[in-house]
Design a protein with these regions (language model features):
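Membrane-embedded hydrophobic alpha-helical segments
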Residues: 1-31, 35
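Amphipathic alpha-helical "stem/stalk" segments
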Residues: 27-148
Length: 148
């Protein structure tokens, strides 16, 4: 009888421990998702603030939205805008990878500002560099670009 009681107590302790671990994992997952969403918002805000506070970069982005193509920018301005677009594309790729890993859900793409990448200039940069991105990201992003 004593042994049975000890085994029952041991079993209940094990079940209780597993339940506790499950709750902790769920809370940790929520915390990671929250921190990741905050990081994405911070990155978007930082990029927007950088453009807003740098007169030259703001002018370049305005030209991008006006439909200019890569050949209409001098080499230095082209490099500035190229680096800005590539930084944004890597951010979008990172969001995709985090969705693939189950850290984020598709709502994360609601905040990426696709018009930036749908511009003539953005499309040129994407077409010239897409081979350097995750092979599963490329068709996903191209489909995302086509959806209005």
């Amino acid at each position: 009888m004593n042994r049975t009681v000890v085994e029952i107590i041991g079993f209940l302790s094990l079940v209780g421990s597993l339940a506790f671990v499950g709750v902790e994992i769920r809370q940790n997952t929520s915390a990671v998702r929250g921190a990741t969403n905050q990081a994405i918002s911070d990155q978007v805000g930082e990029l927007m603030l950088t453009i807003a506070t740098d007169d030259n970069l703001a002018r370049l982005v305005k030209r991008l939205y006006d439909g200019e193509t890569q050949d209409q920018f001098d080499p230095v301005d082209d490099m500035r805008l190229y680096m800005t677009i590539m930084t944004g594309l890597r951010r979008v790729e990172n969001i995709f990878l985090q969705i693939e890993d189950g850290i984020l859900d598709d709502r994360a793409f609601d905040r990426i500002g696709l018009s930036f990448y749908r511009s003539n200039y953005g499309q040129e940069i994407w077409q010239a560099n897409k081979q350097f991105f995750d092979r599963e990201f490329v068709p996903f992003f191209e489909k995302l670009l086509k959806n209005e």
